[in-house]
């Protein structure tokens, strides 16, 4: 990472964060931004109680930002020792030809931009005109909301009534916080949206339907004046199926298909320096490397399906022995890894012995009992993860050479 002089940004009264999208690493925050962060990390700003975005992962914004699309996120920040919402405009810049960054610029709306009290209690949609035709014929669910009346829904088109499962009268007795799973926490977010310039902004929420079920939605919401009333128009798109597919793909990317455990790729992601700091396991942790003894013999003699049964049974045993906070990975083949946060060597050795004994008791129909050998190592000083893994691998190698079915420390 090339170091740049960002100190001139401290002259700005609006908060600015400069973030590396791929690691979600904060490169710089100006003075105004630091005041709003207190002791929070940037990731916590994006995942707080008032945080709303259209993308969970920052790299997914890159294409739209390159095409100069207007993207807004709402962060959870600290003001006067209280959490509140802050809208940010996202801009893509390059520190070098190969080093893109995303700038989060806080949009501090003047008080005079707020939506003033409307006359929406007397609102009645006219039967003719452009708005009536647009509202009635649109196939997307549309809600008209009055922020000045506690988020009262004052109108809904037929698509919205069909989507939420209410008749028009009942729908217009509800407030936006009654259909949003954030509850009243959505109110500061709604008021932030009411200040945003430049049209409607896509943000993701979870909405509750009349039958009690929930749907993931992407909403385009922004201020609008209709018949003299200052309101908010919210266009709703159901993205539940899209979210389900994204979650399935994300799970498949991070987990082993056969055992359901975390995979080697996720191990290296978690053990990146920035991730280790976030998980508070940067120093005091231990590693177990577990290998199934004579696994090739099991495959050759009893078949690969029985070998798969052994691996799945071993995976379940490791999960049952693991403590809260321990992470279990399938490393590949018949090898597994346990990452033990805040665990000294003697505790790691004790847990490894518990695993060894437990595995020896596992019974699978049509198979003799099987055993494991385990290497154990505790992270030392500034040791890299590769250096640590070499030590634990050497310990496992010695355990196998010394007769298998045993635990050895590096």
Swiss-Prot record:
Q: Name one GO biological process term.
A: negative regulation of bacterial-type flagellum-dependent cell motility
Indicate whether Aminoacyl-tRNA synthetase appears among the record's keywords: no
User: Source organism's superkingdom?
Assistant: Bacteria
Q: What happens when the gene is disrupted?
A: Loss of curli fimbriae, decreased biofilm formation, decreased expression of DgcC, a probable diguanylate cyclase and of the curli regulator CsgD.
Provide a GO CC annotation, any one: plasma membrane
The Swiss-Prot or TrEMBL record lists the needed cofactor(s) as:
Mg(2+)
The record's cofactor note says: Binds 1 Mg(2+) ion per monomer.
Q: How is its activity regulated?
A: Activity is inhibited by the phosphodiesterase PdeR. Inhibition is relieved by high cellular c-di-GMP levels.
Does the record bear Repeat in its keywords?
yes
Under the heading PROSITE patterns, the entry gives:
GGDEF, PAC
Instruction: State the conditions that upregulate or repress this gene.
Output: Expressed during transition into stationary phase, expression is higher at 28 than 37 degrees Celsius, more highly expressed on plates than in liquid medium. In rich medium DgcM and DosC are the major RpoS-dependent GGDEF-domain containing proteins in the cell. Expression is RpoS and H-NS dependent.
The record's annotation in SUPFAM superfamilies points to: Nucleotide cyclase (SSF55073), PYP-like sensor domain (PAS domain) (SSF55785)
The record's listing under Pfam families reads: GGDEF, PAS_4
Metabolic or biological pathway = Purine metabolism; 3',5'-cyclic di-GMP biosynthesis
Q: Which GO terms describe its molecular function?
A: diguanylate cyclase activity; GTP binding; identical protein binding; metal ion binding
Chain sites annotated for binding Mg(2+): 291, 334
Chain's role: Part of a signaling cascade that regulates curli biosynthesis. The cascade is composed of two cyclic-di-GMP (c-di-GMP) control modules, in which c-di-GMP controlled by the DgcE/PdeH pair (module I) regulates the activity of the DgcM/PdeR pair (module II), which in turn regulates activity of the transcription factor MlrA and expression of the master biofilm regulator csgD. DgcM stimulates activity of MlrA by direct interaction, leading to the transcription of csgD.
Q: What is this protein called?
A: Diguanylate cyclase DgcM
Q: What is the source species?
A: Escherichia coli (strain K12)
State the taxonomy lineage. Answer: Bacteria, Pseudomonadati, Pseudomonadota, Gammaproteobacteria, Enterobacterales
Q: Which gene encodes it?
A: dgcM
């Amino acid at each position: 990472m090339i170091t740049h002089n960002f100190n001139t940004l401290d002259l700005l009264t609006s908060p600015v964060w400069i973030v590396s999208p791929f690691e979600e690493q904060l490169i710089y925050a100006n003075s105004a931004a630091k005041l709003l962060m207190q002791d929070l990390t940037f990731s916590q700003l994006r995942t707080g109680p008032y945080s709303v975005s259209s993308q969970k992962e920052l790299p997914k914004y890159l294409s739209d930002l390159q095409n100069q699309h207007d993207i807004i996120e709402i962060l959870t920040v600290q003001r006067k020792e209280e959490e509140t919402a802050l809208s940010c405009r996202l801009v893509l810049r390059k520190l070098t030809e190969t080093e893109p960054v995303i700038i989060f610029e806080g949009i501090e709306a003047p008080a005079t931009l707020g939506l003033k009290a409307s006359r929406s209690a007397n609102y009645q949609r006219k039967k003719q005109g452009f708005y009536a035709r647009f509202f009635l014929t649109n196939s997307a669910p549309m809600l008209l909301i009055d922020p000045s009346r506690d988020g009262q829904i004052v109108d809904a088109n037929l698509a919205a009534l069909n989507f939420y499962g209410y008749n028009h009268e009942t729908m217009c007795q509800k407030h936006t916080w009654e259909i949003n799973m954030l509850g009243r926490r959505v109110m500061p977010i709604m008021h932030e949206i009411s200040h945003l310039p430049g049209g409607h902004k896509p943000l993701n929420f979870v909405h509750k339907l009349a039958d009690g079920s929930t749907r993931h939605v992407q909403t385009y919401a922004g201020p609008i004046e209709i018949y003299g009333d200052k309101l908010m128009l919210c266009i709703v798109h159901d993205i539940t199926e899209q979210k389900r597919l994204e979650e399935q793909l994300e799970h498949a990317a991070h987990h082993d298909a056969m055992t359901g455990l975390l995979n080697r790729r996720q191990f290296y992601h978690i053990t990146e320096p920035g991730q280790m700091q976030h998980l508070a396991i940067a120093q005091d942790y231990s590693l177990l490397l577990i290998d199934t003894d004579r696994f090739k013999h099991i495959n050759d003699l009893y078949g690969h399906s029985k070998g798969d049964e052994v691996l799945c049974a071993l995976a379940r045993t490791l999960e049952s022995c693991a403590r809260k906070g321990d992470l279990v990975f399938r490393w590949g083949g018949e090898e597994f890894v346990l990452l033990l946060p805040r665990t000294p060597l003697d505790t790691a050795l004790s847990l490894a012995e518990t695993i060894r004994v437990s595995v020896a008791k596992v019974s699978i129909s049509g198979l003799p009992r099987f055993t494991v050998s385990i290497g154990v190592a505790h992270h030392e000083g500034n040791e890299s993860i590769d250096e640590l893994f070499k030590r634990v691998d050497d310990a496992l190698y010695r355990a196998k050479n010394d007769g298998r079915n045993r635990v050895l420390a590096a």
